[in-house]
């Protein structure tokens, strides 16, 4: 299956206007984490927080709604969110942890959960995955933003990917775009051997593709994920639509997912023939 196993798919957005102002697309991840903290379902969450270095991101343990909101928005540079899970346990003494990550990070988390030692003294209460085609190093991002878009890293407000382009928004209202074909040389090499676009091992996966502007596409994959979404809807913090009732719908998600699988499976075969490391 191009999306992996899932129970249902929906289009959704947060009902909180402050979240929608700050968050990317429908603001689902921020809304889910804030709801979890306020309802005591979660003690803390691992997030990719903003830094002072323009588009760069760094992993952080967020324990308040304010910290979650400050970390809102898509990040296209690598943020090793899994690395702060030890901090969540040892430094913050958290027991109910929410985790969000890219497909490769979700795979690592699932392996950690199944490892005999597991998350010692900690319950990975919910694992959320982000749709991801590829990611960039900070140096690669800097080249895209400054050399192609002509905007200083310190002046970047946010970045986004859509309609075949990489978009850069400055703090001063400038909006520049870069053709995606010009960004490929700056992609992380490890992204070229990943065949997972929709975070297939998460409890809940989300991304903008498939939904209208301002909404998020969500794959509910597990009973744990289904229960979490239902609680959010009942609490009035999330509004949803049937994915079949929106455009462009799952056809576009399927197209991109299959593109990633087919392209990167060929790369894996080529690397194996050359004796280079491959994931399987």
UniProtKB/Swiss-Prot annotation:
GO terms for molecular function: coenzyme F420 hydrogenase activity; flavin adenine dinucleotide binding; iron-sulfur cluster binding; nickel cation binding; oxidoreductase activity, acting on CH or CH2 groups, with an iron-sulfur protein as acceptor. The keyword Transmembrane does not apply. Its cofactor is Ni(2+); iron-sulfur cluster; FAD. Its EC number is 1.12.98.1. Complex of alpha, beta and gamma subunits. Reduces the physiological low-potential two-electron acceptor coenzyme F420, and the artificial one-electron acceptor methylviologen. This is Coenzyme F420 hydrogenase subunit beta.
């Amino acid at each position: 299956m191009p999306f992996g196993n899932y129970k249902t798919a929906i289009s959704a957005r947060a009902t909180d206007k402050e979240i929608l102002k700050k968050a990317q697309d429908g603001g689902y991840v921020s809304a889910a984490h804030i709801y979890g903290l306020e309802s005591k379902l979660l003690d803390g969450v691992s997030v990719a927080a903003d830094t002072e270095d323009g588009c760069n991101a760094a992993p952080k343990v967020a324990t308040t709604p304010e910290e979650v909101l400050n970390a809102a928005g898509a990040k296209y540079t690598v943020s090793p969110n899994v690395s702060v899970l030890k901090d969540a346990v040892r430094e913050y003494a958290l027991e109910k942890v929410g985790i969000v990550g890219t497909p490769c990070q979700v795979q690592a988390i699932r392996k950690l959960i199944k490892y005999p030692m597991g998350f010692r003294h900690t319950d990975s209460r919910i694992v959320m995955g982000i749709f991801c085609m590829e990611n960039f190093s900070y140096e690669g991002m800097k080249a895209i933003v400054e050399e192609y878009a002509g905007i200083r890293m310190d002046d970047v407000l946010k970045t986004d990917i859509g309609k075949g382009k990489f978009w850069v928004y400055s703090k001063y209202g400038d909006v520049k775009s870069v053709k995606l074909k010009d960004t490929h040389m700056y992609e992380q090499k490890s992204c070229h051997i990943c065949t997972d676009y929709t975070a297939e091992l998460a409890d809940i996966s989300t991304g903008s593709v498939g939904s209208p502007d301002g909404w998020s596409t969500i794959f509910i994959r597990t009973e744990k994920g289904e229960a979490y979404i239902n609680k959010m809807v009942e609490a009035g913090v999330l509004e949803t639509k049937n994915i079949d009732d929106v455009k462009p719908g799952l056809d576009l998600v399927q197209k991109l997912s299959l593109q990633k699988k087919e392209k990167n499976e060929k790369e894996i075969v080529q690397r194996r023939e050359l004796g280079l490391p491959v994931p399987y």
